[in-house]
A protein has these predicted regions:
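Compositionally biased terminal segments of proteins
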Residues: 1-197
Length: 197
């Protein structure tokens, strides 16, 4: 990845009023988890996607059902539509950080925990699922003073609200139970998700 290319693209998004936030490896780095990453993952509000396509015209590799993929030089950008309320909230609640002197938007800790928890629930590849779980643990363990019981509640409630079928509810509940177990191991049981009965 070319840092100058990343800075230039993010600057152009900022200058053109594109509402986005970094997620993925670069966002994890801003939350104290060093990660070697091969791409730049950006959540973008759906109504801003045409502007992104115009700004990056000529660099599109392909589109998938999940993302638009652009490559500039050696840097790949995965543009992910924030087409669900939870993803939209991640963009709207993004925090300002600095990258190479440029102010950028990064998903906040609460939304990163949710996004990684959700990703780990949806992955079919065991290695990627395990990496997402490791990321959730790292986000909490490396930021213990910033992670509140309210953040955990938000992540768990938002995940459970994604369920449309009994099977999905069981899957997401298992992930919430896993997270509560992690909090026990980290001696943070006071932050466990405990739904109101």
């Amino acid at each position: 990845m070319e840092r100058e290319t990343i800075k230039d693209v993010l600057r152009r998004l900022n200058e053109n009023g594109v509402r986005y936030c970094l997620v993925g490896g670069l966002a994890l780095a801003h939350h104290s988890i060093p990660r070697v990453t091969q791409d730049v993952d950006l959540l973008v509000l759906p109504e801003d996607l045409p502007r992104v396509e115009e700004l990056l015209k000529g660099h599109e590799l392909r589109g998938t059902s999940v993302a638009l993929i652009f490559k500039i030089g050696e840097t790949r950008f995965d543009i992910i539509p924030a087409n669900l309320r939870s993803k939209r909230q991640a963009v709207l609640n993004a925090i300002d950080e600095t990258f190479e002197g440029e102010t950028i938007k990064v998903a906040n800790l609460r939304n990163m925990i949710f996004l990684k928890l959700w990703a780990s629930s949806e992955r079919h590849e065991r290695a990627k699922r395990a990496q997402d779980e490791t990321d959730v643990i790292g986000l909490i363990e490396l930021n213990p003073e910033q992670v509140s019981a309210e953040d955990i509640e938000y992540a768990c409630r938002t995940l459970l609200a994604m369920a449309y079928t009994p099977e999905e509810m069981r899957k997401y509940q298992a992930k919430v139970d896993w997270l509560n177990g992690v909090l026990d191991e980290l001696k943070m049981a006071d932050r466990k998700y405990q739904p109101l009965s």
